[in-house]
Design a protein with these regions (language model features):
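Conserved alpha/beta-hydrolase "nucleophile elbow" surrounding the catalytic nucleophile
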Residues: 29-31, 109, 113-115, 239
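Serine-hydrolase catalytic-loop signature spanning alpha/beta hydrolases and amidase-signature enzymes
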Residues: 30-40, 51
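Conserved loop-alpha-helix segment in the C-terminal half of the alpha/beta-hydrolase fold
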Residues: 229-273
């Protein structure tokens, strides 16, 4: 694991060796997760493509440095200013990504984002048109604000992030519960354990901030316009049994892009797959990624 300071926060990342392919695949994880879940895909794709995965600010190993008592007074004002500027909105995380790519001298990239990471990838494509050559959204979609559903989701999410004691990691059988959450079939116990760790370790401010800033009515309604403005190719991969981001909502957002035709050329559905496609069906996802990239070689 390597680390780069981005706006005062150490960002953990893994970068595989360069290959003959001109584009770097950049993997962006979702809410309360980390870069770890991309490893099955990276193992399959890194022989052909250089791959970068990193932990979003406040998640995984990208944790803010605690403010010491000696300088807390001087920094409190700047922190308050940052907090009022939607620093946990997807667009803010896309700016973090732009700085990371600049620091790593990556000038040609395809962004592959899961769930919230997909939204960040779309914003990244809008902010970095010279660098981002295309986007693949995994288990990501939306663009329809259903007031009651979103209010319920935000309320449940806030309760979740409030009750995350570290001792939860030691609770017998808790990893078994996480192997069955939001997936079509139970995933390996290893991944259940990883999900518990990432759930508990996410920074409280980031966990709550990303939830609230990414699910406002304005933010959700902005997505279709964002997708429609993108000149780069954008593809959406859905899990047929995803109950978090149902395929119909994935296709809805995909339909605003120029690649979408009567048959939905840029919307792909993977059978027997829930909300963690990169862990549940890595071979199928890798095959779709290879196929997409083969149509955009330059």
């Amino acid at each position: 694991m390597a680390s780069i300071d981005i706006l005062g926060v150490p960002h953990a990342y893994d970068l595989t060796a360069p290959t003959a392919e001109p584009h770097v695949l950049v993997f962006i994880h979702g809410w309360l997760l980390s870069r770890q879940y991309w490893q099955p895909l990276i193992d399959l794709l890194s022989p052909t493509y250089q791959c970068l995965c990193y932990d979003l600010r406040g998640f995984g190993d990208s944790q803010p440095i605690p403010i010491s008592d000696s300088n807390s007074q001087g920094t409190s004002a700047s922190l308050k200013a940052n907090n009022t500027a939607c620093r946990y909105a997807p667009a803010a995380y896309a700016r973090d990504l732009g700085l990371l790519l600049e620091r790593l001298n990556i000038s040609s990239a395809w962004l592959i984002g899961h769930s919230l990471g997909g939204t960040i990838a779309l914003w990244g494509a809008a902010q970095l048109p010279y660098c981002v050559k295309g986007v693949i959204c995994l288990n990501a979609g939306g663009g329809i604000y259903l007031k009651e559903a979103f209010e319920r989701f935000r309320a449940v999410g806030e309760r979740l992030v409030k009750f995350r004691p570290r001792v939860l990691c030691n609770l017998p059988g808790i990893d078994w519960v996480f192997t069955r959450d939001s997936v079509a079939r139970p995933i390996a116990r290893y991944w259940g354990r990883q999900r518990v760790i990432d759930f508990v370790m996410a920074h409280p401010e980031a966990a709550r901030g990303t939830l609230l800033d990414s699910t406002t009515e304005a933010e959700v309604n902005r997505l279709p316009e964002l997708v429609s403005r993108l000149k780069q190719p954008v593809y959406f991969i859905a899990g047929a049994k995803d109950t978090i981001m149902e395929p119909k909502y994935v296709r809805h957002l995909a339909s605003f892009h120029q690649l979408f035709q009567a048959c939905g050329d840029n919307a792909i559905e993977i059978p027997d797959c829930g909300h963690l496609a990169m862990v549940e069906q890595p071979e199928a996802v890798a095959a779709q990624i290879r196929n997409i990239l083969s149509h955009h070689p330059g």
